[in-house]
């Protein structure tokens, strides 16, 4: 039985996908793309609110991929769930644990904007590493520099070109269409999208006096009579966004479309968008949105499943993500 232990082996580590409560539907879509089944994982809460996790089968020597968006009203529970599952995998001798986090919670707290503030995005990175996470896969971080908070590999994917393909299927006059950056910080990304679509770019200039509040001071670029595509990384309360939309309309913009990777949609955000003078608001399924694609709703959703699945495949098979033929998937 043991005579050949000294000989080289061609043992292939098995890939196993698991879903957290923050990405159940997206996890199913990713598994379907990969022709895999989601594996059994017990995730419960005790009566006092503490989280319990247990893998239903052995993960010894396996490549474990745990899919979890850290967003929504239970954002803290979802973060804790991720940490506990990572610890369970480490203690069960998994070969590696990759946290697939389509939406990275606390990403906006990436610097000290005022004195005596924390840098919570860095804290979350520290917690994930301490829990035993070996690799991160995420989509459209609020700030790309967050990758530098980690001492483990981070694959930063983008949904930008998924939006590009979505709008290319629209019957737009591209000579009369403009991509609008919601602020100066997104100007580079807006330029990438405008180049991909073959149209012009404009930039909104804002003043931000407090959290979740900003005032549009003006627009750099010509938007009068043009179809406008506003692109951002996330929509939270949508108050600032609706203010930008109103400003664009006052300046003579034509049809307005909104696109954002992460539809956080806090408070009255969905109601604000449904009543705003826009044609559509397109988000991805990085964060679940029950009203998206329902009849009569302006909220539309496209999936990042294939982009994420392709990344998982290339990580597992040790192929390059950026050179795999997946197109423009890595930011």
What are these regions (language model features)?
Residues 1-331:
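PRPP-associated nucleotide enzymes
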């Amino acid at each position: 039985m043991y005579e050949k232990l000294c000989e080289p082996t061609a043992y292939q580590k098995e890939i196993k996908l698991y879903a957290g409560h923050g990405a159940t539907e997206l996890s199913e879509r990713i598994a379907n793309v990969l022709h895999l089944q989601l594996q059994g994982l017990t995730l419960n809460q005790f009566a006092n609110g503490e989280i319990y996790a247990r893998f239903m089968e052995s993960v010894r020597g396996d490549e474990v991929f745990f899919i979890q968006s850290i967003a929504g009203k239970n954002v803290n529970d979802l973060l804790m769930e991720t940490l506990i599952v990572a610890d369970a995998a480490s203690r069960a001798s998994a070969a590696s644990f990759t946290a697939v986090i389509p939406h990275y919670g606390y990403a906006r707290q990436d610097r000290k904007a005022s004195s005596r503030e924390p840098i919570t995005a860095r804290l979350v990175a520290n917690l994930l590493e301490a829990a035993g996470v070996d690799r991160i896969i995420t989509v459209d971080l609020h700030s790309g520099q967050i990758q530098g908070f980690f001492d483990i590999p981070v694959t930063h994917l983008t949904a930008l070109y998924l939006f590009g393909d979505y709008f290319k299927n629209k019957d737009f006059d591209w000579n009369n269409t403009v991509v609008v950056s919601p602020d100066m910080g997104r100007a580079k990304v807006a330029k990438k999208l405008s180049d991909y679509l073959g149209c012009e770019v404009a930039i909104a200039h804002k003043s931000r006096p407090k959290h979740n509040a900003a005032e549009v001071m003006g627009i750099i670029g010509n938007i009068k009579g043009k179809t406008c595509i506003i692109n951002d990384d996330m929509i939270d309360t949508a108050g600032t966004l609706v203010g930008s939309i109103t400003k664009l309309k006052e300046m003579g913009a034509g049809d307005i479309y909104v696109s954002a990777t992460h539809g956080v949609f806090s408070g009255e955000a969905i109601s604000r968008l449904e009543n705003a003078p826009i044609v559509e608001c397109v988000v991805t399924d990085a964060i679940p949105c029950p009203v998206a694609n329902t009849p009569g709703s302006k909220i539309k959703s496209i999936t990042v499943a294939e982009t994420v699945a392709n990344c998982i495949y290339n990580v597992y098979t040790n192929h390059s993500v950026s050179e795999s033929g997946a197109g423009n998937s890595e930011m």
